A protein has these predicted regions:
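N-terminus-centered regions that define maturation/targeting leaders and the start
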Residues: 22-188
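Absolute N-terminal positional cue centered near the fourth residue
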Residues: 4, 17-23
Length: 188
């Protein structure tokens, strides 16, 4: 895809994500691993990534309820809008989560047996598919926004392990029925 088209798709995806408000209804996303709104060490990036953090890099458990009528699948994204990149940092993308799923288990990332059947983890801003935990610069606290988007289609045909976050965001927003948002914080 030419660079100009990629830039256009990325800009459109970001605009669509910002333009759609979080749900004011019954659609809710929660995490038993982060009940106080703080990200514990288990969900922080591991030393192996070379960013200076020393967590377990384990994806958190998430549960949801109240999805809108007509939901046929979900997309989950985890984004740090405070990352010093100018556009934030995407830490996790899971697409094609079946409509009958009610959550994800702790440590589901990277373990197909723990993800709902048909779910696909796509690339993140780490350049690989799967969960990459929080690791803000020292002395800074960042927000980590978990967004579950209910879709009116069964699967995003562009959802492959190689798909970039902006591509998934663009198509998810084009088919979004509603969103549930959970914001947690982490600083070091």
């Amino acid at each position: 895809m030419p660079a100009r088209i990629c830039s256009t798709v990325a800009a459109a995806a970001m605009a669509a994500m910002i333009a759609m408000p979080a749900s004011a209804g019954d659609f809710r996303l929660t995490s038993p691993d982060m009940p106080d709104g703080r990200m514990p060490a288990a969900q922080v990036l591991s030393a192996a990534y070379g960013f200076g953090c020393d967590g377990d890099n384990r994806s958190p458990a998430l549960t949801w309820e109240g999805a809108p009528a007509g939901t046929r699948s979900f997309v989950l994204t985890v984004h740090d809008p405070d990352a010093p990149t100018g556009i934030g940092w995407t830490h996790w993308v899971v697409a094609n989560i079946p409509a009958d799923a009610q959550g994800l288990d702790t440590g589901a990332s990277g373990n197909a047996a723990r993800l709902p059947a048909g779910a696909v983890e796509t690339r993140t801003d780490f350049g690989l598919p799967g969960y990459g935990g929080a690791c803000p610069p020292e002395g800074r606290e960042h927000r980590y926004v978990f967004t579950l988007t209910a879709l009116g289609m069964e699967a995003l045909p562009v959802a492959t392990p190689e798909a970039m976050p902006a591509l998934i965001g663009f198509f998810a927003n084009a088919h979004a029925l509603d969103k549930a948002v959970l914001e947690v914080r982490y600083g070091r």
